[in-house]
Amino acid sequence: MHEGVQVSSKLEQLQALLAPVVVALGYECWGIEFSAQGRHSLLRVYIDKEGGVLVDDCAIVSRQISGVLDVEDPISVEYTLEVSSPGMERPLFTLEQFAKYVGEQVKIKLRSPFEGRRNFQGLLRGVEEQDVVVQVDDHEFLLPIDMIDKANIIPSFD
């Protein structure tokens, strides 16, 4: 089985397991990243709430998630758990999140090349069905959401 497929299904399993825990604590589960790197992996859970996230919020969620992970044991390798806010360079995971940030500058990395490239940096123009519309210079790209490996807002300090 392809490693990307394993990570993707693992990510879906973790999302189904952990998102309800985060929501039950009164936070939004902004997104989950799981990267298997050799013998050590990283599980990063992004939380958000109205008014922002404090360090104490991350600690509360981390304790609860750790308990669930200890009982359910969905990760068979050694890993580090990080709970954090999305921050200024907010990662984008869903079409709804992309739609919320139309008009912002974004950086997008694809899982595999699309129209000869994997990296796109430009203006987020919108969402059309299952595609994210990004304008790079004078060209618009319709990037399928399922091809996006990583996407982040580029903060502007105007």
UniProtKB/Swiss-Prot annotation:
Keywords from the named record: Cytoplasm, Ribosome biogenesis
Segments forming a coiled coil: none
Subcellular localization(s) per the UniProt record: Cytoplasm
A GO biological process held by the record: translation
GO CC list: cytosol
Chief localisation class: cytoplasm
Domain of life: Bacteria
Family assignment from sequence similarity: Belongs to the RimP family.
Purpose: Required for maturation of 30S ribosomal subunits.
Protein name: Ribosome maturation factor RimP
Organism placement in taxonomy: Bacteria, Pseudomonadati, Pseudomonadota, Gammaproteobacteria, Pseudomonadales
Gene designation: rimP
